[in-house]
From Swiss-Prot:
Keywords: Disease variant, DNA-binding, Metal-binding, Nucleus, Repeat, Transcription, Transcription regulation, Zinc, Zinc-finger. GO terms for cellular component: nucleus. A zinc finger (C2H2-type) spans 294-316, 322-344, 350-372, 378-400, 406-428, 434-456, 462-484, 490-512. SUPFAM superfamilies: beta-beta-alpha zinc fingers, POZ domain. GO terms for biological process: hematopoietic progenitor cell differentiation; regulation of transcription by RNA polymerase II. It comes from Homo sapiens (Human). The lineage of its organism: Eukaryota, Metazoa, Chordata, Craniata, Vertebrata. Residues 159-171 bind DNA. Residues 212-245 have a biased composition (Basic and acidic residues). It is linked to Immunodeficiency-centromeric instability-facial anomalies syndrome 2: A rare disorder characterized by a variable immunodeficiency resulting in recurrent infections, facial anomalies, and branching of chromosomes 1, 9, and 16. Other variable symptoms include growth retardation, failure to thrive, and psychomotor retardation. Laboratory studies show limited hypomethylation of DNA in a small fraction of the genome in some, but not all, patients. This is Zinc finger and BTB domain-containing protein 24. Signal peptide: none annotated. May be involved in BMP2-induced transcription. InterPro entries: BTB/POZ_dom (IPR000210), SKP1/BTB/POZ_sf (IPR011333), Znf_C2H2_sf (IPR036236), Znf_C2H2_type (IPR013087), ZnFinger_BTB_dom_contain (IPR050457). GO terms for molecular function: DNA-binding transcription factor activity; RNA polymerase II cis-regulatory region sequence-specific DNA binding; zinc ion binding.
Length: 697
């Protein structure tokens, strides 16, 4: 209802009582439709869309957190340690001003409101308790479960000038008003009622506020064995008696979350008792009397409850009561066994909302999502450096401790942890411990085996949301989805050809690698062609048989000292020259390449016959001369006649030295070979050679 009041200056001031309710109702409608929601809060893998502005206006915790981030804020936040149903009820209050909850869950909701500093809810609950002083609060019976309905009083001054719904005096009026405003009543799940531990993880440590459901549990803080097994040690390992009032102890690493929250040391879970009152005192419960500390006798670590101490002591005794039925591996906690079992089943219950990647643990999901947000949530307490993943922080911490990263002894590659090194070592040893029982194929990693088994079963659980194509491996699906985006981020450095996937680029680079090797080989041969002709050897580019009257002519330079000839049983010889390189076969080209790759001064030319094809020379192993291309020297022609070849074949076991008789009238002379006994050449060039020595006149 609008009210108008005259002002002395003649101006009118119009006030609408319904405006604040209308704005809240509009926000709630937008939240349900997902319209203009600029933030996603994830609690126990449940996603809550919301508006940053309204959260900051309703919660001092969110307000300080957003203010600390400034302009680099993000859109996805993971709230650790909270209950999804409890947070949903609290978010409903922020958007409507009404709280609909069961009587047993109000304590946990109030503790969450205290931590998030939603003081309007705390004050509304205080007023509700004062106005309903009877032991049994007024309830609205829905499906047999008592439900407490709390709203802000109309006559209370709002903190931020926000209007609140009028206080309803009767249940019938309240019920009709809720129906008129189309409010949705959230029923609390039984699991919420059974939860007795509220854990909030922050950057500075772990803050635990235990809210008991019964007075006898307050006086005797014990836990049932079944609950003991399900509670991981990490929730209370860092407890310190000094943190009883809400001060978080300093831990070595910042805790697992996507966003870096406001330091918990500036907050108290139960709030300022002078201004806002204690949550437990409001609820009319007795405070748990202080008992003896649960301290570990081995390391002196302190725990809040004895069952946490019992779990911790297994780290000293080595007790692992939880055994895997598949491989027999033991674990100290039931939670660790459940995570391990997923390795056998392939279950990955945690899915990234950005890229749909599935992961086995919540911790893995938190670290993965930090890569999308770009937020570096893990802080080194020594130097203050930030990291996006916990393993990066652990690796960095070795700088302060002096410990080095695990290193492979074979290739000296370093790894983040020992488990990664262990997997890498299998690439050197060839070990493949994971074998498929169906086809016998082995793998180095268990994940590869699990993916392979899906092929036998025909399972393709990963489907593309665009074209519907299914895949047996999540990584294959991710690579496929990149094709739909049209992006090609991978570019070839050689030809600038772009690819959408990295594996396609690697396959493409192999083509350039082969071309480069072939180009290097041809450039080596081509660059030394002139030197080969001038300084080493030239034979006529044809094959001739010794059955005719033809002769073999060899052009050699003065730098040639010896020619070691090892004939085969065949009567024919074929050889390659530099001038005939364009007609070479692949084998001949390779042989000619060998001719140009020896570094020392020319001493021997070895012509060795091929065993399978004795008509052709298999290789020319010749050492280059050091003479430069600009130098000139006489070229001599050596003629090997039919008789000479026959003589070499007949006496290949004997050592002979052939002298050359020349004249100096022509730089290229035909030389006649004469035979004289001589010493054998060095035997390290060719086994059992028959040398032909050449002396220059």
């Amino acid at each position: 209802m609008a009210e108008t009041s005259p002002e002395p200056s003649g101006q009118l001031v119009v006030h609408s009582d319904a405006h604040s309710d209308t704005v809240l109702a509009s926000f709630e409608d937008q939240r349900k439709k997902g319209f203009l929601c600029d933030i996603t809060l994830i609690v126990e893998n449940v996603h809550f869309r919301a508006h940053k502005a309204l959260l900051a206006a309703s919660s001092e915790y969110f307000s300080m957190m957003f203010a600390e981030e400034g302009e680099i804020g993000q859109s996805i936040y993971m709230l650790e340690g909270m209950v999804a149903d409890t947070f949903g009820i609290l978010l409903e209050f922020i958007y409507t001003g009404y709280l609909h909850a069961s009587e047993k869950s109000t304590e946990q909701i109030l503790a969450t409101a205290q931590f998030l500093k939603v003081y309007d809810l705390v004050k509304a609950y205080t007023d509700f308790q004062n106005n309903h002083s009877s032991p049994k609060p007024t309830t609205l019976n829905t499906a047999g479960a008592p439900v407490v309905v709390i709203s802000n009083k109309k006559n209370d001054p709002p903190k931020r000038k926000r209007g609140r719904p009028k206080k309803v005096n009767t249940l019938q009026e309240e019920k009709s008003e809720l129906a008129a405003e189309e409010e949705i009543q959230l029923r609390v799940n039984n699991s919420v009622q059974n939860r007795q531990n509220f854990v909030v993880k922050g950057d500075s440590g772990v803050l635990n506020e235990q809210i008991a459901a019964k007075e006898k549990e307050e006086s005797e803080p014990t836990c049932e064995p079944s609950r003991e097994e399900e509670m991981p040690v990490e929730k209370d390992e860092n407890y310190d008696p000094k943190t009883e009032d809400g001060q978080a102890s300093q831990s070595r690493y910042s805790k697992r979350r996507i966003w870096r929250s406001v330091k918990l040391k500036d907050y108290k879970l139960v709030g300022d008792q002078e201004d806002h009152g204690s949550a437990k005192r409001i609820c009319g419960r007795r405070k748990r009397p202080g008992g003896p500390e649960a301290r570990c006798k081995d390391c002196g670590k302190v725990f809040k409850y004895n069952h946490f101490l019992a779990i911790h002591q297994r780290s000293h005794t080595g007790e692992r009561p939880f055994k895997c039925n598949e491989c027999g591996k033991g674990f100290a906690q039931k939670h660790s066994l459940q995570v391990h079992t997923r390795m056998h089943t392939g279950e990955r219950p945690y899915t990234c909302t950005v890229c749909s990647k599935a992961l086995t643990t919540k911790h893995s999901l938190l670290e993965h999502m930090s890569l999308h947000s770009g937020q570096k949530s893990f802080t080194c307490d020594q130097c203050g450096k930030y990291f996006s993943q916990n393993r990066q922080l652990k690796s960095h911490y070795r700088v302060h401790t002096g410990h080095s990263l695990p290193e492979c002894k074979d290739c000296h590659r370093k790894f983040m942890d020992v488990s990664q090194l262990k997997k890498h070592l299998r690439t050197h040893t060839g070990e493949k411990p994971f074998t498929c029982e169906i086809c016998g194929k082995s793998f180095t990693a268990k994940s590869s085996l699990q993916t392979h088994i899906r092929i036998h079963r025909g399972e393709k659980p990963y489907s593309c949301g665009i074209c519907g194509k299914s895949f047996s491996d999540s990584s294959a699906k991710r690579r496929h989805c990149i094709l739909h985006t049209g992006k090609k981020p991978f570019s070839c450095p050689e030809c600038n050809l772009q690819f959408a996937r990295l594996d396609n680029l690697k396959a493409h680079l192999k083509i350039h690698s082969k071309e480069k090797h072939a180009s290097d080989a041809s450039s080596i041969s081509g660059s030394s062609n002139t030197e080969e002709v001038r300084n080493i050897l030239q034979l006529q580019p044809y094959q001739l048989s010794t059955s005719g009257e033809q002769e073999i002519q060899l052009l050699v330079t003065d730098s040639v000292h010896n020619i070691n000839f090892m004939p085969g049983p065949s009567q024919g010889i074929s050889i390659v020259t530099a001038e005939s390189s364009q007609n070479m076969t692949a084998d001949q080209a390779a042989n000619l390449t060998l001719l140009t790759q020896q570094p020392e001064q020319l001493q021997n030319l070895i012509l060795s016959a091929q065993q399978e094809q004795t008509e052709h020379i298999q290789s020319l192993n010749m050492i280059e001369s050091q003479m430069g291309p600009s130098q000139t020297e006489p070229v001599h022609v050596i003629t090997l006649s039919k008789e000479t070849l026959e003589h070499l074949h007949a006496h290949q076991e004997q050592t002979e030295e052939l002298h050359l008789a020349t004249s100096t009238s022509d730089p290229a002379q035909h030389l006649q070979l004469t035979q004289e006994p001589g010493p054998p050449p060095p035997t390290h060039h060719v086994p059992q050679p028959t040398p032909l020595g050449q002396e220059q006149s």
